């Protein structure tokens, strides 16, 4: 399978994960047939970058998501938190965000700690989606 097909397949898999959690997610390219959207759209408040790569440089991936979400903000004024959802072959999906962005999702941290602003946190899909769903429910007032 070539890398483009692998990427499309990964985006569809991640969209399906969100659909199983109750979101109307779909591939960004499928959304309107052109670029300029996240890899998966239909999930409020976040910019989703999907990667299926055995040798992923997650820092470069999060930087790409940050650049792309900043460009989207310039066009729409919609501020989205970047997250990279990634996995290697035969492994589970993981979600990586900057620690400060994750803290804005989770609301607070039970202890004080000094962290670098470029610190990254990687969580399993199941842990991350619980944090995200609590944030989204609170923010939407549902």
Ranges and model annotations:
Residues 1-142:
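Catalytic phosphate/metal-binding cores of nucleic-acid and nucleotide-processing enzymes, i.e., regions
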